[in-house]
Curated annotation (Swiss-Prot):
In the embryo it is expressed in cortical neurons; expression increases during neuronal development. InterPro entries: KBP, TPR-like_helical_dom_sf. Belongs to the KIF-binding protein family. Its main location: cytoplasm. The gene is Kifbp. One of its GO terms (biological process) is mitochondrion transport along microtubule. This is KIF-binding protein. It holds the Pfam family KBP_C. The keyword Cytoplasm applies. It comes from Mus musculus. The keyword Cytoplasm applies.
Length: 617
């Protein structure tokens, strides 16, 4: 390798790097980029001292694009001789000038410098002295184009970097030089170990950016794979912020939850808990410049966000079990439950092979710590109340943890979503409970946590959330009423207290369904002729349940009963008429529509008989 540049060039270059690392908040308030501009001036001086680019290197053409930087553009060769060494050093300077301009929000100028860097390096891109810088320049161009929302261009640069890394490791394999080494004397060059660490970090960044690009392109399977690989590599190379790593792992768990891959989701969440526990305990490094624990609000927010991911895990696993075991009216099907019990052994037998295929985080003590968390949490669908209760209690623990940060004062929407998840945990647990009185108590708990929210919320600002809560409270009262009716049916002679309770629950359900339906009216209190797609199904369900509730009111007054039947018929008729004029609505409520048609046919006859009976008395 040629001799290192003279001391003046080396000193100016090192001074430029030092200024580049100065954090923006340490600059004067009116000159936030003062250190960046200082670094830029020094880099331009270094470029002038190095002299012009070698004559055999052409300037990049105006239409140079990411495809021109792909691996197929000319055969790479070793960077030997003074001309090649000067080209390499100029490329390093161009790279830092590019990053500098991007940092000061001058994206076009930054792009020009980075493209020039690639142009200088292209003949040597696979050599020991160039490959790391070439990948870094392409990574930065990938980020730049991503910020411009030119995702395909970003993807091309980043995939080119990934391919170059793979080709280099396959054909050469030895740790390449870090770009800064081109400005260091021989005795200050990095060790092989440090070179390897830095190069692997560059590749990890490449995978991280690719994960984001694939996510943006809605290639979710690929995005999850790259995110998982990034997180794994960060642990292997001990290059991560505990708080950031944990939130990324918890976020990845949501992908696996949606895919119903509960073992993988549990692994991500368990790892998130363990790594989050390191926050503030790891000494500051280049990768973690400040102790994250020094930011208490961010710490508690991230803790709350991870807790919410755990809630979703527990809730989705329980709901998936319910879907697998319920009959056509939403009750526990004992035959399906028995079938799933028989499958349990097979699921347990498959666990080991699934675990071997999955990407595991950590080794040694870290792996043991993650496994210790995993072992306390089930990943198989609960098949009875005791198993479901285990998940419910875990979910409820994380509800309390999430609510510590996401309070109604300051985090209205987040707080309400956590409360709704808490309510949903009670609702799905009630499915596994055989005792109807205990099920009633679970719905009562739901109502107790949801009703206060209706007082705190201004529907003018939180209309959508208000509707969701009104509908959910109405449904909870509706379910309680059905349970009380079922309890009364088992009694030979229900007393007046039970009748009064049924009517009270009926009245409360009607109140909240009506509040929901009234929220759909226009400022003149007129119900819409066309119901929006986003509220069509809930609106039709509310109408159907209101019709059914009026038919369930228990009264000794014949006149009142006739009025209730007429109101019930009116709501059933609304559903039938609306679906006739809006065929798309029929697809949303097929079962309810058939029942409504039946009731529209039967109720008038029932009402006529009732009137005839009244006339005789």
């Amino acid at each position: 390798m040629a001799n290192a540049p003279g001391p003046e060039i080396r000193e100016k270059f090192q001074a430029a790097l030092a200024l580049s690392r100065v954090e923006l908040h340490k600059n004067p308030e009116k000159e936030p980029y003062k250190s960046k501009y200082g670094a830029r001036a020094l880099l331009e001086e270094v470029r002038a001292l190095l002299g012009p680019a070698p004559e055999d290197e052409d300037e990049p053409a105006a239409d140079d694009g990411p495809g021109d930087q792909a691996l197929g553009a000319g055969e790479p060769r070793e960077a030997e001789g003074p001309g090649a060494q000067r080209a390499l050093r100029l490329a390093v300077v161009e790279f830092h000038l590019g990053v500098n301009h991007i940092d000061t929000e001058e994206l076009s100028a930054g792009e020009e410098h980075l493209v020039r860097c690639l142009s200088l390096l292209r003949p040597y891109r696979l050599s020991l002295g160039c490959v790391s810088l070439y990948i870094q320049a392409q990574n930065n161009l990938g980020i730049l184009w991503s910020e411009r929302e030119e995702i395909e261009t970003a993807r091309t640069y980043l995939e080119s970097s990934e391919a170059l890394y793979s080709q280099y490791m396959k054909e050469i394999g030895s740790p390449p030089l870090d770009p800064t080494e081109h400005f260091l004397p021989e005795e200050e060059k990095l060790t092989e170990q440090e070179r390897s660490k830095r190069f692997e970090k560059v590749y990890t960044h490449n995978l991280y950016y690719l994960a984001q690009v694939y996510q943006h392109m809605e290639m979710f399977e690929k995005a999850a794979h790259y995110c998982h690989s990034t997180l794994k590599r960060q642990l292997e190379h001990n290059a991560y912020h505990p708080m950031e790593w944990a939130i990324n792992a918890a976020t990845l768990s949501q992908f696996y939850i949606n895919k119903l891959c509960f073992m993988e989701a549990r692994h991500c969440l368990s790892a998130a808990n363990v790594i989050f526990g390191q926050t503030g305990k790891i000494p500051a490094t280049e990768d973690t410049p400040e102790v994250e624990g020094d930011v208490p609000e961010l710490y508690h927010q991230r803790k709350g966000e991870i807790a919410r991911c755990w809630i979703k895990y527990c809730l989705t696993l329980m709901q998936n079990a319910q879907l697998s075991m319920q009959d056509n009216i939403g009750e526990l099907d004992l035959d399906k439950q028995s079938e799933l019990r028989a499958l349990r052994k097979k699921e347990l037998d498959e666990e080991e092979s699934v675990r071997k295929r999955a990407v595991q985080f950590g080794t040694g003590e870290l792996c043991d710590a993650i496994s210790a968390v995993e072992e306390k949490v089930r990943y198989l669908r609960p098949l009875d109340f005791e198993e479901a209760r285990e998940l419910f209690l875990l979910g409820q623990h994380y509800v309390c943890e999430a609510k510590e940060f996401f309070q109604i004062d300051g985090y209205v929407t987040d707080h309400i979503e956590v409360v709704q998840d808490h309510s949903a945990l009670f609702k799905v647990l009630s499915f596994f409970e055989a005792d109807m009185e205990r099920r009633c108590k679970m719905h009562k708990r739901r109502i107790a946590m949801l009703e206060p929210l209706t007082v705190d919320l201004n529907p003018q600002y939180y209309l959508l959330v208000s509707r969701q809560i009104q509908f959910e409270i109405a449904h909870a009262y509706y379910d309680m009423m059905d349970l009380k009716v079922a309890i009364a049916d088992k009694l030979r002679d229900p007393d007046s207290h039970i009748v009064k309770k049924i009517n009270s629950l009926n009245k409360s359900a009607l109140k909240y369904y009506q509040l929901f339906l009234d929220s759909l009216r226009d400022p003149n209190k007129v119900f819409p002729e066309h119901i929006g797609e986003d509220v069509l199904r809930p609106a039709m369900l509310a109408k159907f349940r209101v019709a059914r509730l009026y038919g369930k009111i228990i009264t000794a007054d014949p006149k009142k009963e006739l009025e209730n039947l007429a109101t019930s018929l009116e709501h059933y008729k609304f559903i039938v008429d609306y679906c006739e004029t809006h065929p798309e609505a029929a697809q949303e409520i097929e079962v309810e529509l058939e029942l409504s048609k039946e009731m529209v046919s039967l109720l008038p006859t029932k009402m006529e008989r009732f009137r005839a009976k009244m006339a005789l008395t």
